[in-house]
């Protein structure tokens, strides 16, 4: 594999991962089957996700620090099977980019653009994503840092507003574990585990570009922890403003919550703040999966310049997002009830674990042969 020229700084990767983890999870309810304990689902999923990433994808990264996921897959299991597995991940990354694009379009239509064709919204988003990707991974990561700072300011503003508003009641978050751990585990597996923390497997395509490789695992763990805290804050806001019953039934609870908040009849109708947050985080969620699919195709098909793949893969993502489901209800049902079992669990956990074990075995055999020959 050729030495990578473009590099990512640690702070830029941290910002990128945080925005990626927030993605559509910041507005789509996560773990609400556990009702008041949804925040425990988020924290538990984050803890498991950090441990898993440190052991399995992190272990693979330590074995092959200069190779992307699709590249070292061929090194581990051979060129033929490795290529097939890599191609499966290429399709997976494109599919999840399409799902997130559909999430983005559905929310914008439900919130403010009901008269705008879905196709137009998708084109605007994917053209913007494709343009930043075409500028290179370094520009993409630096752009993430700029918008990360803006999103931090938005979150601080939202928190202050909730604390000062008379519509929020944090007693609604109680009781903690009122029904025990069973609802938490039920909500955690598999949806709370695979979304969003299991999706970190996609970052295995980008870690080789980090210019301080020894910081990779600390950066990913810190970014995952911060995103979990922000998602917990969003859950607290939803439950304290709407109550647990409405928050658990709402399709986009954060949007509903902030549309109700007001401060002294001066600051009100803050649903536009949620739209801004959604556009930014969705941009980097869609862009990350699309970028990963482009790098995977670049590696598998030996394309000289990956930037030539931006348009064709962008068109595939757009068309798939438009045809993926008949309506938003069907789309959410598939994303929460079907995709986690049949796609996320095998591709986020099962296959990486197998690759890691085979990689360790191959290294042990190689070390034993080297010791025997010396």
Each model region followed by its residue ranges:
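Selective recognition of specific alpha-helical transmembrane segments in multi-pass small-molecule
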Residues: 44-56, 89-100, 129, 150-165, ...
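Membrane-interface interhelical connector segments
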Residues: 241-271
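Membrane-interface loop-to-helix entry segments
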Residues: 104, 132-162, 344-351
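Hydrophobic alpha-helical segments and their helix-loop junctions in multi-pass secondary transporters
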Residues: 94-97, 133, 152-177, 193, ...
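Membrane helical hairpin/interfacial module
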Residues: 23-118
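Hydrophobic, membrane-embedded alpha-helices of multi-pass small-molecule transporters
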Residues: 7-26, 41, 45, 89-93, ...
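Extracellular loop-to-transmembrane helix junctions
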Residues: 29-58, 337-354, 363, 367-373
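Membrane-interface "cap" regions at the ends of multi-pass membrane proteins
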Residues: 1-37, 209, 358-374
């Amino acid at each position: 594999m050729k030495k990578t020229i473009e590099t990512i700084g640690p702070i830029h990767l941290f910002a990128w991962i945080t925005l990626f983890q927030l993605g559509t999870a910041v507005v789509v309810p996560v773990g609400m089957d556990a009702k008041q304990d949804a925040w425990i689902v988020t924290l538990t999923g984050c803890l498991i996700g950090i441990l898993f990433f440190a052991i399995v994808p992190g272990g693979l990264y330590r074995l092959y620090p200069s190779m992307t996921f699709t590249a070292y897959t061929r090194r581990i299991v051979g060129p033929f099977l490795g290529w097939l597995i890599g191609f499966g991940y290429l399709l997976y990354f494109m599919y999840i980019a399409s799902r997130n694009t559909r999430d983005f379009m559905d929310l914008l239509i439900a919130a403010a653009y009901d008269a705008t064709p879905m196709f137009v919204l998708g084109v605007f988003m994917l053209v913007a994503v494709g343009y930043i990707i075409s500028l290179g991974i370094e520009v993409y990561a630096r752009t993430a840092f700029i918008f990360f700072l803006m999103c931090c300011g938005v979150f601080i503003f939202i928190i202050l507003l909730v604390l000062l508003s008379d519509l929020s009641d944090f007693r609604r978050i109680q009781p903690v574990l009122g029904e025990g751990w069973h609802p938490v585990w039920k909500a955690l597996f598999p949806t709370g585990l695979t979304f969003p923390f299991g999706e970190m497997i996609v970052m295995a395509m980008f870690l080789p570009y980090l210019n301080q490789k020894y910081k990779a695992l600390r950066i990913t763990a810190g970014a995952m922890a911060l995103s979990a805290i922000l998602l917990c804050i969003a859950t607290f806001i939803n439950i304290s403003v709407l109550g647990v019953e409405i928050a658990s039934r709402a399709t986009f609870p954060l949007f509903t919550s902030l549309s109700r908040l007001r401060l002294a009849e001066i600051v009100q109708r803050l649903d536009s703040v949620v739209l801004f947050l959604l556009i930014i985080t969705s941009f980097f969620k869609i862009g990350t999966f699309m970028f990963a699919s482009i790098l995977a195709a670049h590696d598998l098909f030996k394309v000289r310049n990956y930037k030539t793949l931006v348009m064709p893969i962008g068109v595939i993502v757009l068309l798939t997002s438009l045809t993926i489901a008949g309506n938003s209800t069907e789309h959410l049902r598939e994303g929460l009830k079907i995709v986690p079992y049949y796609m996320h669990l095998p591709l986020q956990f099962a296959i990486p674990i197998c690759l890691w074990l085979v990689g360790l075995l191959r290294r042990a055999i190689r070390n034993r042969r080297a010791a025997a020959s010396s």
